[in-house]
Amino acid sequence: MTQLVLLRHGESVSNRDGCFTGWGDAPLTPRGEREAEQAGNLLKKAGHKFDICFTSELSRANDTLRIVLSVMGQDEPVVQRNWRLNERHYGALEGINRWKAIRKYGFCPILSSQCRFDAPPPPLDPADIRFPGNQACYATIDPGELPLGESMRQAFARMLPYWQQTITPEIQRGKRVLIVAHKHILRGLIMQLDGLSIIQLIKLSVATGRPLIYELDDNLHPIRHYYADTGLTGHTG
């Protein structure tokens, strides 16, 4: 048996302000920092140690991981950051308050992009500064691979090769793995691990700052999963 720990970053400024964040680099709020500290304490108390940690290119996930490892007193794990673990890209909605987005684009299109697996948000213009292809930190990536906006399905498809080709082999080698990422990316991983249906996925909630522990068999099939702060099986926050 091996363990895998999934953690959604602590509350960000955009979470607090009710904005679509996506690839926008919103920092943690003081509450988000406390959530990261609490997660670190829970993992330390449970005796967790990590050989390798995976996270996105976004500061709210990076800072959550940094705080967790500091609280745990762990400076030695390898940390790999990759854009494929970035949050779902919200296209033209990036950085916009949800109510403003509804007023601009209409209630039904916004609701559809939030509740339907295959519904993308309104796309960005490629000339928009919010397009990752126009940002220096993604300059080494083929612009054709970078999103102008993503449905849930498209975000999962972008993440999946990294899970299969990079993260899974580390788990199979017996490495103790922590993934600090984002709501939709973690939902995609949970869908993959647990074989959830699309209907089950739509109902799935992943709380900020709560470590979700998976116990896996030799074939990486889940034996059970539970939150570190409750020990209770389940995903909802």
From Swiss-Prot:
Detail which positions bind substrate. Answer: 8-15, 21-22, 60, 87-90
Q: Which reaction does it catalyse?
A: (2R)-2-phosphoglycerate = (2R)-3-phosphoglycerate
Record-listed E.C. numbers? 5.4.2.11
Provide this UniProt record's keywords sorted from A to Z. Answer: Gluconeogenesis, Glycolysis, Isomerase
A Pfam family that this protein carries is His_Phos_1
SUPFAM superfamilies in the record, alphabetically? Phosphoglycerate mutase-like
Looking at the UniProt record, the site noted as Transition state stabilizer sits at H182
Q: Which GO terms describe its molecular function?
A: phosphoglycerate mutase activity
Q: Which CDD domains match?
A: HP_PGM_like
Biological processes annotated in GO: gluconeogenesis; glycolytic process
User: Active site: which residues?
Assistant: H9 (tele-phosphohistidine intermediate), E87 (proton donor/acceptor)
Please state the pathway this protein functions in, per its UniProt record.
Carbohydrate degradation; glycolysis; pyruvate from D-glyceraldehyde 3-phosphate: step 3/5
Q: How does it assemble?
A: Homodimer.
* Function comment: Catalyzes the interconversion of 2-phosphoglycerate and 3-phosphoglycerate.
What family does the entry list? Belongs to the phosphoglycerate mutase family. BPG-dependent PGAM subfamily.
Q: State the HAMAP family in the record.
A: PGAM_GpmA (MF_01039)
Designated name of the protein:
2,3-bisphosphoglycerate-dependent phosphoglycerate mutase 1
Species of origin reads: Nitrosospira multiformis (strain ATCC 25196 / NCIMB 11849 / C 71)
Gene label:
gpmA1
